[in-house]
Amino acid sequence: MIQIVCILGSSWGATRWSRKGLAIALVAILPIIGTIMMLTVPRQHKGVLLFGYYLVSCLAAITPLIYTWHVQNTAGDTKKKCTSAMVFIGMCTGNVIGPLLYSVDDAPLYRPGLISNLVMFALVAIIALLIPMYLALLNKRHAKRREELGKSAIRIDESMLKKKEMTQKGVEMEAQDQRQEQDNGFSDLTDMKNEDFIYVY
């Protein structure tokens, strides 16, 4: 139940504020806190330890955000399939390695495994905050390229817009009678080569 609430809540937040990287980083804070609790709280405080364990289980919300984020930030049929395969292989590798970090010799505290997880959660949070900066740089490069080609530098990413915003944008487009000439938005180009591609933060 906790995982379901966390998945739905983080997905709603990522859509509401159009920031998937920030959503991943915020979700990663919960298992970080939970892991620290499990490492530091004395064993006799069972309720607190259980609460820490529940916080760690919130990591399940990170997976769907990563899957949707990488798909939105990849263009080109072949590249998208290869990227999806790499992400899937990476997650499967993590699922294989994860249990091996916990040994019966480390019972009952399992400190090496918990410390490894703590480092991993911290890295996820840091990387999720750094990636949007890189994506913003790529968006600026694309905007500059559009200007060089005589196109409008400003593009609106419609993938994260709400229904009301989409309707309003449609009305504005009709009122201005704008037409996009040579728009590569639906071309089978990779995101790096397609100047009309917009990266999602």
Where are these regions (language model features)?
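A generic transmembrane-helix signature of 12-TM secondary carrier transporters
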Residues: 10, 28, 32-35, 51-53, ...
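Interfacial helix-cap and linker-helix signal at transmembrane-aqueous boundaries
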Residues: 13-14, 101-109
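C-terminal ends and interior cores of transmembrane alpha-helices
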Residues: 25-44, 57
